[in-house]
């Protein structure tokens, strides 16, 4: 496993080397071995190949302990050719374990894994270094969470705990928007009845994550970011409506989300470390009281 020690805080790469408009936009589906673009994450073949240091702006993904990356949304055609031909990478190849230390300071190290048949080979090591560099683009892009922290406040206003926006990253003119659907049944309903446009769904070990890709706000102007937030919120409200129509238990707004935003803002803006237990306190996925 290789570690890249060089790291730079830069906002400039946001608008450098923007990708052209995508002609074939994928749709979020419940992936199976037949229709999935990425191989299934199998713990029997999993082995770590690289390590990337995070920044405080990534803490929204750190608390989830996994970060799915739809590679087809941020890589060029040639890079996708290399990834498919010489690598065996699942969609959620970046994981982290924060339950041991319980302290989140924003500079945790993400472990990148692959599922190739020859772990430790020269090809595997080279792929690990390249994967680390590609993943670092997403880490750099997470600085948009610091620049537009209001995005989470707007999108998650009075939303239930079952559907929550968790963070964004901005890579090569593509804005990847992540939100978490707590229950498997709710995720199935959302994917079955709501059209999300260019999107991807990851059925992870710990979370159900839906990733939306927006290229309308590629210039990062205030008005376009506001329009993007409004569109994201409308899609989330559609998901909430679909879930409410097909379930018995009522959906109530999360009373813990504002406290979480205060913790995240203190870490992202002022580098105040937080405890993982404080972020997840009173979190009960089976409670109907909106926590």
From Swiss-Prot:
Q: Pfam families from the xrefs?
A: Adeno_E4_34
Q: What are the entry keywords?
A: Early protein, Host cytoplasm, Host nucleus
Example GO CC term: the record gives:
host cell cytoplasm
Superkingdom of this protein's organism: Viruses
**Main localisation, per the record?**
host cell
According to its UniProt record, where is this protein located?
Host nucleus; Host cytoplasm
Main function:
Plays a major role to prevent cellular inhibition of viral genome replication by nuclear bodies. Assembles an SCF-like E3 ubiquitin ligase complex based on the cellular proteins ELOB, ELOC, CUL5 and RBX1, in cooperation with viral E1B-55K. This viral RING-type ligase ubiquitinates cellular substrates prior to proteasomal degradation: p53/TP53, LIG4, MRE11-RAD50-NBS1 (MRN) complex, ITGA3, DAXX and BLM.
Can you tell me which family this protein belongs to? Answer: Belongs to the adenoviridae E4 30 to 34 kDa protein family.
Q: Share what the entry says about its subunit structure, partners included.
A: Interacts with E1B-55k.
Q: What is this protein called?
A: Early E4 34 kDa protein
Recorded source organism is: Human adenovirus A serotype 12
